[in-house]
A protein has these predicted regions:
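Phosphate/nucleotide-binding beta-alpha loop and adjacent structural elements of enzyme active sites
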Residues: 1-272
Length: 272
C-alpha cells in the first residue's frame, strides 16, 4: 500500500517510518529517548517490536504507563539518557514541555523545577535488560542529543535507523559529524519547524542509516526498466512544462505583420 493510499505524508516522521517498514525493516527493539507523552508513530508502525521509553520528567509517568500497558511488549524508565550513568540535575520548564541537564546536584529543594534524577546510558540499559538488536533509536532531548549518542556507541553497531531532532541554530553539524564517525549516513529530513520571529527553518527530525546497511543496498537513482522508463517520462514532462512556462511568460510579444496595400500600375501613374 502506498503512502498516498494510507494518507500519510512522506515528509513526516510517520511517513519516514512507514517507508522503512515497507522496505522490510523490522527492529527487534525500538528505543524512544525523550518520550515525553509518547511518540505514537513509533509504536503504531512497529507494534511487534519491543519498546523502551525513556523520559526524565516524572510528571509524564502516568501517561507512559498507560501507553506501555497497551503495547505488546513495552516498558518505561523515568531517567535521563546521557553519556555516563550517575545522578544529574534536571531543570524543567514550567509547562513540563522542555528540560535540560546539569552535572551539578541540587541542594535547594525549594525550586520545584529543579530536581535530581538518575542518569543512564543506552549501552548499559540494553545490556542490563537484554534488549536485542537490530535497534531503532529516536532521540529528542532539547539539544543534548550528542550526549545520548555518546552513551550508545556499542548498540549503534547493531542499529539500522536513528532519528535525531537537530536544530539549525545549534548542534546539527555536530550530530552529523558524530553519526558519520559511527558509520551512518544522512537518510531523511522530516517534520520541519520554523521559528515564528522570521519563519527561518529552526529544527528538523533527521534520520540516519548505516552506510553499508539495509537502506544503502541500492546506490543508483532508479533501477529496473520500469523505474527508468517512468523516470524518463517524468523528466520529459518536467522539461515540457518548463518550455511551456517560458513560452507563456518570457517570450517576446508577437508583433503583427505590416499591412501592404496592393498597387495598380498604369501607363503614367500608380494607384494605391
Amino acid at each position: 500500500m502506498s503512502q498516498q493510499q494510507t494518507g500519510t505524508l512522506r515528509n513526516s516522521m510517520s511517513g519516514s517510518l512507514l517507508l522503512a517498514k515497507q522496505l522490510g525493516f523490522e527492529p527487534k527493539t525500538v528505543i524512544d529517548v525523550g518520550a515525553a507523552l509518547g511518540t505514537f508513530n513509533l509504536y503504531e508502525t512497529f507494534p511487534d517490536s519491543r519498546h523502551l521509553l525513556i523520559e526524565p520528567i516524572a510528571e509524564n509517568e502516568p501517561y507512559l504507563a498507560k501507553i506501555c500497558r497497551k503495547l505488546k511488549s513495552a516498558e518505561y524508565i523515568i531517567a535521563a539518557a546521557t553519556k555516563e550513568s550517575g545522578v544529574f540535575t534536571l531543570n524543567v520548564s514550567p509547562g513540563m514541555v522542555h528540560s535540560s541537564l546539569s552535572e551539578n546536584r541540587v541542594t535547594d529543594s525549594s525550586n520545584p523545577y529543579l530536581r535530581n534524577i538518575p542518569a543512564i546510558t543506552l549501552d548499559e540499559i540494553c545490556k542490563e535488560r537484554n534488549l536485542p538488536g537490530p535497534y531503532l533509536i529516536k532521540v529528542d532531548v532539547d539539544g543534548q542529543e550528542l550526549d545520548v549518542l555518546a552513551g550508545a556507541t556499542e548498540i549503534l553497531q547493531q542499529t539500522e535507523y536513528v532519528i535525531v531532532e537537530v536544530t539549525l541554530f545549534g548542534q546539527m553539524y555536530d550530530v552529523m559529524s558524530f553519526m558519520k564517525s559511527q558509520g551512518f549516513a544522512a537518510y531523511d529530513i522530516v517534520d520541519l519547524s520554523y521559528r515564528p520571529t522570521d519563519q527561518a527553518l529552526w529544527q528538523v527530525d533527521m534520520a540516519f542509516v548505516k552506510e553499508s546497511g539495509h537502506f544503502r543496498r541500492e546506490r543508483g537513482f532508479a533501477t529496473g526498466e520500469q523505474d527508468i522508463e517512468a523516470l524518463n517520462s517524468h523528466l520529459k514532462a518536467y522539461r515540457e512544462s518548463f518550455i511551456k512556462h517560458i513560452d507563456t511568460h518570457y517570450s517576446d510579444p508577437v508583433e503583427p505583420e505590416p499591412q501592404v496595400s496592393q498597387a495598380v500600375v498604369g501607363e503614367d501613374y500608380v494607384i494605391i
